């Protein structure tokens, strides 16, 4: 059985995320995930949410064995070509340890819809968002 750890980054400090990653690796966890969100829907203010890909790249430099990935990356937030390049780069930086979790993002009914609005993107219907995931997979 493989066991992974999810680090919830909402209002987290990098040094705490780093310590958790090192502890997870020392404890024998197989993988480590962090959310790829732009904001904490439950916080009106605070330090914000660390950007997932930047954190994962930094964690790749301090860990040696544990797999790393975003859980899950909303394909609407990045062009699939940019995402493919990001994934290839992180795969190289980690020495093959990238776990790529991708998804369609939340519907208009979720608090995460505000992330697309902040980027100037509309929150599309479920079937359109699902199709965009398939398109991103095909491109990658």
Residue ranges and their predicted role:
Residues 2-12, 77-140:
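Flexible, glycine-rich active-site loops centered on histidine and acidic residues
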Residues 40-41, 75-77:
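Short, small-residue-enriched loops and turns at beta-alpha junctions
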Residues 63-71:
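Conserved catalytic cysteine-centered active-site region
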Residues 33, 67, 99-101:
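Conserved beta-strand positions in the central sheet of alpha/beta enzyme cores
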Residues 1-62:
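N-terminal beta1-alpha1-beta2 module of alpha/beta enzyme domains
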Residues 61-64, 95:
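Residues at helix-coil transition
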Residues 36, 70-72, 102-106:
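Glycine-rich, histidine-containing beta strand-loop boundary motifs that form or position
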């Amino acid at each position: 059985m493989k066991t992974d750890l999810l680090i919830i980054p909402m209002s987290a400090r990098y040094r705490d995320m780093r310590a958790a990653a090192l502890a997870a690796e020392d404890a024998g966890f197989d993988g480590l995930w962090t959310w790829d969100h732009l904001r904490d829907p439950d916080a009106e203010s605070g330090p914000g949410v660390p950007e997932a890909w930047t954190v994962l790249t930094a964690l790749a430099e301090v860990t040696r064995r544990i797999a790393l990935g975003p859980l899950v990356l909303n394909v609407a937030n990045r062009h699939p070509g940019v995402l493919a390049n990001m994934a290839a780069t992180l795969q190289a930086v980690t020495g093959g340890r990238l776990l790529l979790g991708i998804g369609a993002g939340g519907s208009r009914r979720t608090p995460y819809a505000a992330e697309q609005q902040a980027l100037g993107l509309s929150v599309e219907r479920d079937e359109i968002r699902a199709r965009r995931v398939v398109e991103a997979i095909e491109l990658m």
